[in-house]
From Swiss-Prot:
GO MF term (any one): ribosomal large subunit binding
Highest taxon, organism lineage: Bacteria
Protein name per UniProt: Ribosome-recycling factor
Location in the cell: Cytoplasm
Organism of origin: Francisella philomiragia subsp. philomiragia (strain ATCC 25017 / CCUG 19701 / FSC 153 / O#319-036)
Family the entry assigns: Belongs to the RRF family.
Length: 185
């Protein structure tokens, strides 16, 4: 029973970290990275489809992405989707492919993005702590129903705290790495 609670808490915390990593990957740094376009969608045969599912997105150099659609007619739609996204990018249509230069971030925008990183990370930490609270509540419920002893409950809560500390440290490491990427000029 206790092991199930611990495994469930750890799995849920890991999923929270994955979501945080995805959210942080969407925040644009000064460098080109294909994940920047992961949430940009186009209308493809009547459904909203991510660009990454209809084209190859490659890094041409540190500040330029190359997009090669699998169907020639999609270049215009992809260009329009990138322009209308909130990323502030201006792609160049080369006919059968696109080039997306990454403009350098100014100091003010960098600071805004660092604040956004901190906010996203704090949301991740709160989610992890909520999972800890739920797991501790489950442990207390078992103790209340006399299914485990007080020593077992204390040990389980200590283990949950260790898992929580480890996951929060990983979230902080993701944030620090992203902040460093943002501050590179």
């Amino acid at each position: 029973m206790i092991n199930d609670i611990l495994k469930d808490a750890e799995n849920r915390m890991s999923k929270t970290l994955e979501v945080l990593a995805d959210d942080l990957a969407k925040i644009r740094t000064g460098r080109a990275h294909p994940d920047i376009l992961a949430h940009v969608t186009i209308d493809y045969y009547g459904s909203a489809t991510p660009i990454t599912q209809v084209a190859n997105v490659t890094v041409l150099d540190a500040r330029t992405l190359g997009i090669t659609p699998w169907e020639k007619g999609l270049a215009g739609k992809i260009e329009k989707a990138i322009i209308t996204s909130d990323l502030g990018l201006n792609p160049t249509n080369l006919g059968d492919s696109l080039r997306v230069p990454m403009p350098a971030l100014n100091e003010e925008r960098r600071k805004e993005l660092v604040k956004l990183v901190k906010s996203e990370t704090e949301s991740g930490r709160v989610s992890i702590r909520n999972i800890r609270r739920d797991a501790n509540g489950d442990i207390k419920e078992l103790l209340k129903e006399k299914e485990i002893t007080e020593d077992e409950a204390k040990r389980a809560e200590d283990n949950i705290q260790k898992i929580t500390d480890k996951m929060i440290a990983q979230a902080d490491a993701l944030a620090v790495k992203k902040e460093q990427d943002l501050m590179v000029v």
